[in-house]
Amino acid sequence: MKRRFTGLAAIAAATALTLSACSSDNGRGSESNDDATDDAAVTVSEGATVGVSLPWLGTQNWKEADTIFKADLAEAGYNPIVQAGDNKVANQQSQIQAMVEQGAEVLVVGPIDGTQLGTVLEDAQAAGITIIGYDRMIENTEAVDGVVQFGSVKTGEFQAEALLQGLEEEKGEAPYNIELFAGGPADPNAQLFFDGAMSVLQPKIDDGTLEVVSGQTDFTQAATQDWDNGKAQSRMDSLLSGNYADKEIDGVLSPNDGIARAIITSAEQAGQDIPVVSGLDAENESIAWIASGKQYSTVAKPTQELVDQTMEIIDSLAAGDGMPEANDSADNGVKDVDVYALEPTVVTQSNLEEFFADNDDVMEIINDNK
């Protein structure tokens, strides 16, 4: 079986750099590491069936996860079952139950709604299945053994810092007129992205550097149901028509690339100069827009790195070594969950070619749009 050790080594080296390096419970229902079950006892068999439950395939990162998991699990000698729930919680619950019935020994779950999988995952855990959250936290249940994700609060901080940098570079002197967008409220990452961003932006709002002209500064006001680009564009249309008839919008905090493109399209259609807009996921279309100067930034969270880290955990279980040591933890509402946290990267026009230098396909996109 193919083994991957580079990610775990990087995690060990990065421990001092994580947002919180507190240790966490990884035992079945225990409250502390002192009482935790010995993780070395948690194993899976050679060639185990691994179920991967993704929320949907509507964005580039989830399409990539679907393709990469199928290929990498099969190459490593496992039996993969990879499905997506089309953003419907009932679909995901049924798919996970079917994976259990088909003999999955590991479940990798990117939840549609992190609070709605407790019952089906608790049944899976009772059957001895190891449960790994992928990209998103599984909330309000003991039935999660660890989560692989890029630091969500850090991602939000990076988005906000890039927005401020872009405003200074492209929009002259402060004050700046901005608006705030957030992701889908069912996705636990969306709140964390927003919280991280606001930790950077709120002091600038308070001191007058930034003005949120609409006054919509709460997560509930900024949230975009289901991460739907069309809903984001409709909200941006309304914000512009209601607040910017006689003024320019300078920048927008956007939680991902699809919403960023919707925001920019709305601004163009309203006759506004293109605002400075943040993003997330380094989608190919947004890479083209960054190369051309249309979108200011994105935050790269390479899917391959997430899958590689998940594979290393599965390989560790198959080798009889149990769950590897994590470098972070987070409260899921019931317990502290081990987090295998990876570091995101801000990408702007200034470092675009350097970051993607080894990716021929993306470099072709960049060169076609410079």
Predicted regions and their residues:
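A residue-level marker of the well-folded mature domains of exported/periplasmic proteins
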Residues: 2-8, 22-370
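Repetitive helical segments and hydrophobic/amphipathic motifs
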Residues: 12-13
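C-terminal motif of bacterial Sec signal peptides marking the signal peptidase cleavage site
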Residues: 16-21
